[in-house]
Design a protein with these regions (language model features):
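A compositional/biophysical signature of low hydrophobicity enriched in polar/charged and small residues
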Residues: 1-131
């Protein structure tokens, strides 16, 4: 907390109290290390759009949760109901993942060429003053 306090011009106890309050209110939901997928053997990323078959939309999240290579899955508007981000060891691995989703719907896949805006934290804004 001392380093964080130095960065934001607050004492370590003040930072500790604020962090604890943010944890308790659900602003901070957890802590995680940022791992480079390439460094651990997953050099390929892909975005898979899934259009569920009739009466199958509830099964897409089940397939996504049971597929370890799926690192994100979002329900979206538009022609496709879900978008999943996957990390792959090889292109051969993609076929198996797509086969799992094919049971519940149609897929369209895009291979990620680069990430000009990598994952980043949201900007923090000050709370509006009451008055």
């Amino acid at each position: 907390m001392a380093e964080l306090g130095r960065r934001v011009n607050l004492s370590a106890p003040a930072v500790g109290e604020r962090v604890q309050r943010m944890e308790e209110t659900g602003v901070i939901t957890g802590y995680a290390a940022q791992v480079d997928p390439k460094a651990i053997g997953y050099p390929i990323a892909a975005v898979v759009r899934i259009r569920p078959a009739r009466r199958q939309p509830h099964k897409v999240p089940e397939v996504a949760r049971s597929t370890p290579e799926v690192v994100e899955c979002h329900r979206v508007t538009g022609e496709d109901c879900y978008i999943a981000k996957v990390h792959l060891r090889s292109m051969d691995d993609l076929e198996g993942i797509l086969d799992r989703f094919a049971v519940v719907g149609q897929t369209t896949t895009s291979i990620v060429h680069s990430a000009p805006v990598p994952p980043r934290p949201l900007p923090l804004v000050d709370e509006p003053e009451e008055g």
